[in-house]
């Protein structure tokens, strides 16, 4: 009789654990379809179309921008930068204002909305190599980086990760 009571008690404990785990699973599944924000809140307003953003880079030295784009690369060390595709095989390198926030490292292929100051800049060989290491490139690939490059850049105040 005592063994039966012990087994019954153990089954009740297991059922409680299963119910808790099931509840956590349901909560996490419901949250996965929501947007996630990083940094400052992005204000309502118009988003610059990707087809127009390149013209702004050509026409202005610096400008405030809010755009929606697909993430093509993310720092695999801590999520401290990302690249966004804007069409015509062009990317924007996004850093985060004062390194005050980071993004998840597993968002390549996801869409984001970013808001911040956009500008063109020359990036040194050392910095290009640093970013290659952050991406996890091997030294044979890194050794091929021998020239600085002009890039489109954006210092983001805020990021919204879309579902």
Model regions and ranges:
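OB-fold and OB-like single-stranded nucleic-acid-recognition modules
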Residues: 34-163
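Bacterial Sec-dependent N-terminal signal peptides
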Residues: 1-37
């Amino acid at each position: 009789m005592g063994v039966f009571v012990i087994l019954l008690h153990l089954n009740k404990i297991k059922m409680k654990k299963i119910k808790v785990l099931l509840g956590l699973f349901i909560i996490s599944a419901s949250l996965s379809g929501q947007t996630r924000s990083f940094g400052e809140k992005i204000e309502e307003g118009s988003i610059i179309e990707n087809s127009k953003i390149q013209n702004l880079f050509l026409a202005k030295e610096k400008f405030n921008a809010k755009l929606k784009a697909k993430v093509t690369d993310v720092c695999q060390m801590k999520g401290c930068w990302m690249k966004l595709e804007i069409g015509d095989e062009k990317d924007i390198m996004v850093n985060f204002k004062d390194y005050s926030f980071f993004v998840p490292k597993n968002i390549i292929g996801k869409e984001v909305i970013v808001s911040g100051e956009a500008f063109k800049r020359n990036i040194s060989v050392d910095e290009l190599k640093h970013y290659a290491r952050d991406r996890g490139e091997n030294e044979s690939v890194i050794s091929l980086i021998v020239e600085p490059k002009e890039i489109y850049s954006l210092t983001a105040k805020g990021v919204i990760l879309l579902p």
